[in-house]
Amino acid sequence: MKEKDIYFQKLNELISNAYVPYSNFRVSCLLLTDGGWFAGVNIENSAYSPTICAERSAVSSMITSGFKQIFKVYILTDTIVKDIGTPCGVCRQVLSEFAKPETPIITYNLKGEKFFYTLEQLLPFAFNKDALK
């Protein structure tokens, strides 16, 4: 099976677990890390600000399990629009805490179209721990 098919299939299975009663915009995420694979889906809340994005859900699982290095990010959004599925700004910043600038971020839409980015392309001026020195 092709790489695209494996990750798209897993993301497609996960996306149905998203809790999105308000926006109906589902997102699933897989992180390849120093501890293996971690998954997340978006979880909405009626107050909106407590909503958790799929990427941060996966990062939380990774950290809870004792791991801290992200090597690859895979994301599926339930849209057929090209290029709509990149992480939001908050998620980009959170990912930058645990991933290198050259970390691949691979996104899919529901048609299975695949788009490639690096974290640095999506967050060129990341605020990081070096800024706090």
From Swiss-Prot:
Matching entries from Gene3D superfamilies are given as: Cytidine Deaminase, domain 2
Q: Where is the CMP/dCMP-type deaminase domain?
A: 2-130
**What keywords would UniProt list here?**
Hydrolase, Metal-binding, Zinc
- Stated EC number for the protein is 3.5.4.5
Q: What are the binding positions for Zn(2+) in this chain?
A: C53, C88, C91
What InterPro entries has UniProt attached to this entry? APOBEC/CMP_deaminase_Zn-bd, CMP_dCMP_dom, Cyt/Deoxycyt_deaminase, Cyt_deam_tetra, Cytidine_deaminase-like
Q: Where does substrate bind?
A: N42, I43, E44
Residues annotated as catalytic: E55
GO CC annotation:
cytosol
- Give the reaction(s) catalysed: cytidine + H2O + H(+) = uridine + NH4(+); 2'-deoxycytidine + H2O + H(+) = 2'-deoxyuridine + NH4(+)
Q: Which cofactor(s) are needed, names only? A: Zn(2+)
Task: Please share the entry's free-text remark on the cofactor.
Answer: Binds 1 zinc ion.
- Output one GO BP term: cytidine deamination
- Its Gene Ontology molecular function terms? cytidine deaminase activity; identical protein binding; zinc ion binding
Q: Assembly and interactions?
A: Homodimer.
Query: What PANTHER family does UniProt report for this protein, alphabetically?
Result: CYTIDINE DEAMINASE
Physiological role: This enzyme scavenges exogenous and endogenous cytidine and 2'-deoxycytidine for UMP synthesis.
Family to which the UniProt record says this protein belongs:
Belongs to the cytidine and deoxycytidylate deaminase family.
Q: What is this protein called?
A: Cytidine deaminase
What is the protein's species of origin? Mycoplasmoides pirum (Mycoplasma pirum)
UniProt gene name: cdd
